[in-house]
Amino acid sequence: MVKSISHVVKRPGRVFGDPDVEIPVAEDLTTTPGIPLREADVSFFSRVEPLETQNIEKGADRDWVWSVYSPEVADYMRGHDERMKPLVDSAEVSANLKPSGASRNGKDLTEDIRRAARELGFGEVGFTRFDRRYLFECKRSWAKFPHAICLAMEQDYDQTQSLPSLEAEHAHFDTYEFESKRGAKLADLIREMGYHAQIHSPRDPISVMIPMFVAAGLGQLGANGQLLSPHFGSRARLMMITTDAPVTYDKPVDYGIHAFCQKCLICVERCPARALVKDKVWWRGAEKNKVIYDRCRPVMAIYEGCGICMKVCPIQKFGMPAVMNHYVQTGEVLGKGTHELEGYSLHDKGYFGPGRLPNFERSFFDIPHGRREDWLFEQFKERIAGEDIPTDGELTEFARNVKSAIDKNGITRDT
Ligand code: SF4
Ligand code: SF4
């Protein structure tokens, strides 16, 4: 049954030079531009429970994953970290680089920068206020400039459809390496225009990024916890540049995703870990489907980064224009129930088509939790709950480990 259309969103084509596309949003998918927010709650939580980088907040499991990576994944990740290090190092000092050209007397540079970013290969480019409420606590002093340029780079289509696989991990992390170099070029261009440009590496961000991408109109949050961008859904890798260049902010857009996900729910139904939840909740001031991190993490670590929730998303596979047109024409979710969209394989468990999920023992989900030092204390509590009193040597060893964990938090990076 053909649906009534509420509005049509016009967006630039997938790559620079492509014609604009139109995305029809059905009336029954209309909610709000961006994401439903309770601004007072976002501000409150940022003050009393500031966000922290996963490498500190989830430090215990970030160390643990290295013990379960396959040799191939571990080798590739070590190589990636080495290749990224100079890029992350240069991003860290980029705020202090002086503009190299004369400023253009306050001329609005939004479209100059957008065009340059598109020419460099970024598929989605948007501008918004750098919202300090999403800063990580340990990087509070890093943010120097008021405007955020949100940049999304598409990762390879074919490699992504093989998720979960080492090949798909290449698509993921190779894109980080490529876009970091392109981001550095864009920052150089902004300095030549006479302004500062601070790079926020995709491997060492200073804040949560998705809320600012949504504010800049580059997509909406999907039930899989990822940004669904118009052309490639969550098959995009995100980075930001902050600047003091004069720019005009874009506005959040209602693509219909907030409501569409509740009709689709493919990612929720196909997640092997049952880590995605059907019902939206209010979380730190935003209404969303909240991922259960502790269920996702072991599957991600053991099955090559998993990413099944990305692979099975119709927006990722077919793009938003095709999916929304299909919904308007039929009232159905394009590809739902098909092996092509929903099927996947896990290396030791085989193939799972629509309606079939793997099972795991309860112990599979018993992994280290929380910060490194908190996990050490948890283990210590268990140790002294037994009958034995620790020896002086064990106490010294425990203190050394806690000190080392705390020191690591001070120097840690999201690499
Ligand atoms: S990465 Fe895998 S385990 Fe984690 S939420 Fe997505 S589908 Fe589920
Ligand atoms: S799979 Fe469906 S429910 Fe999940 S993010 Fe994609 S569109 Fe939303």
Give residue ranges: language-model regions.
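Non-catalytic, usually N-terminal nucleic-acid engagement modules in DNA/RNA processing proteins
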Residues: 1-165
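Flanking helices and flexible, charged tails adjoining ferredoxin-like Fe-S electron-transfer domains
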Residues: 1-31, 282-415
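Arginine residue identity/basic-tract feature
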Residues: 11-14, 38, 47, 62, ...
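Compositionally biased, intrinsically disordered low-complexity regions
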Residues: 15, 19, 36, 128, ...
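Residue-identity detector for threonine
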Residues: 30-32, 53, 110, 128, ...
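Short, structured coil/loop segments at alpha-helix boundaries
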Residues: 70-73, 107, 254, 338, ...
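Catalytic cores of enzyme domains
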Residues: 103, 114, 123-335
